[in-house]
């Protein structure tokens, strides 16, 4: 396994699984979604806000505001199980009527090639 992917995976596991109580507390404190590796433009295409790796917690009340993932153009054209549609679940969270209030445990301006440290 690639060392960067191993660090990335361990960071996501620590922040979304091992520290699940922190996730729940932060959602209870007002965040719409919590996780690691929240990316926004210019690191992503204009209008795309994603948890890279798709490992996050979100409030059901926020998820209910999102359009159905089945309404995404690529999924309509290629199907939900198509390789072409593989990133649609990542972009779905950030493509609703408003951007979620996010707690990113990895911190702002993270660099995917330098994720040797992980918080909290």
Predicted regions and their residues:
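ER/Golgi luminal nucleotide-sugar-dependent glycosyltransferases, focusing on the catalytic module
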Residues: 1-120
């Amino acid at each position: 396994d690639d060392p960067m992917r191993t660090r990335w995976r361990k960071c996501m596991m620590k922040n979304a699984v091992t520290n699940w109580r922190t996730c729940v507390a932060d959602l209870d404190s007002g965040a719409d979604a919590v996780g690691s590796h929240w990316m926004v433009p210019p690191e992503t295409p204009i209008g795309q806000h994603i948890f890279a790796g798709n490992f996050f917690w979100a409030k059901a009340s926020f998820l209910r505001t999102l359009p159905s993932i089945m309404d995404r153009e690529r999924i309509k054209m290629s199907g939900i199980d198509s390789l072409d549609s593989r990133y649609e679940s990542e972009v779905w969270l950030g493509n609703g009527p408003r951007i979620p209030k996010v707690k990113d445990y990895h911190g702002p301006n993270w660099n995917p090639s330098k994720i040797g440290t992980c918080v909290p």
